[in-house]
Amino acid sequence: MVKINVICIGKIKDKYIRDGISEFSKRLSRYANLNIIELPEEDDNKGIRTAITKETERIIDALNKRNRSYSILLDLKGKLKSSEEMAEEIENISLQHSEINFIIGGSNGVDDELRKLVDFRLAFSSFTFPHQLMRLILMEQIYRWISITKNIKYHK
């Protein structure tokens, strides 16, 4: 069973998003060992650049504790893939790595240092989504990818 870490900045504030994440976490528990790692959000009153730097450092520290894992950054500048393509990608990654990290930066983004460090940068769309909502969208897609590879009747 593959271990999936969702490394993200901040806590979920809206109940409907928490409920959706909880539902997909429950569904995923049959197929993956899911771990959501919430890192503190930096107050940007000292400047956005400072906030981005500190949040990026926290993400890198979390990644450094997970050696031999494969890291995917959700990034507007990343590569677009279909659900089917990503399902195949995740299947291939899980054959070589027992642990996969999905990273969602804070509302101000991440440093280029992190972009260089990760194994893959994935764009979901050219649209901008709130980072908390993106966590729910990611959870749904992880479940969709697994449902595709396991032939679960979910993806149409």
Residue ranges and their predicted role:
Residues 17-21, 49, 83-87, 115, ...:
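Conserved strand-to-helix beginnings and helix N-cap segments that scaffold or border functional pockets
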Residues 112-156:
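Structured adenosyl-cofactor binding patch, chiefly the S-adenosyl-L-methionine
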Residues 32-33, 38-99:
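S-adenosyl-L-methionine/SAH cofactor-binding core of RNA-modifying enzymes
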Residues 12, 76-79, 106-109:
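Short glycine-rich anion-binding loops that position phosphate/pyrophosphate groups of nucleotides
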Residues 3, 97-102:
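Loop/turn-to-beta-strand initiation segments
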Residues 1-28:
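N-terminal beta1-alpha1 ligand-phosphate binding loop
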Residues 6, 72, 105, 138:
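Conserved RecA-like P-loop NTPase ATPase core
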Residues 100-113:
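Short glycine-rich, acidic/polar surface loops and turns
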